[in-house]
Amino acid sequence: MQIITAEDYRLYGGLKRPELESGVEVMITAANALITSLLGMDDADAVDQLITTKPTRKKYFLSSPSATSVTKMTINDKEIDPEQYKLYSDGVILLKFNPPEGYMDVEYTQGGFNPMPEDLKLAACMLVDHWHKQDYRQARTIGGETVTFNNTKSGIPEHIRTIIEVYRRV
């Protein structure tokens, strides 16, 4: 999923030149891939998900909150008419009947964020900046003095990870 483009990073950094420093384009691609992975999303458009059904439940959750449409739904090998359920924009399916106990197979298409949240774009830009400035180093020498500091476990600074966690899918 493309979270930021080179143009977004230029805007974030206030850069006037059309070209970026070497390696920044690769860092942008890597930041997009890493954040997409941390969000629990993938780039596949078509998804097939198996969900356990209970007769007392009518509300079910898809693993992707960006589901745009259900292409096919079956419960215990019986196809369900689209009039019998509703897909909400946050990936929730509400059935209009009590399903039998068993399994619901949902085939759906997913999209990304539309539009991309500005704070998520900011997190991606800050991550590229973090890598570009090599802020991940454990020690720095400033004015003859060496300062040592702890790295984060994930390699992503806490303030960036906090933004990503808001949109993370479990």
Swiss-Prot record:
Compartments in which it is found: Virion
GO cellular component: virion component
Signal peptide from the UniProt entry: none
Superkingdom of source: Viruses
InterPro entries: HCP (IPR056472)
Coiled-coil residues: none
The keyword Ubl conjugation belongs to this UniProt entry's keyword annotation: no
GO BP term, pick one: viral capsid assembly
Keyword terms: Late protein, Viral capsid assembly, Viral release from host cell, Virion
Keyword field contains Phosphoprotein: no
UniProt protein name: Head completion protein
Main location, first listed in the record: virion
Physiological role: Head completion protein that closes the capsid once the viral DNA has been packaged. Probably part of the head-tail connector by binding to the portal protein and to the tail completion protein.
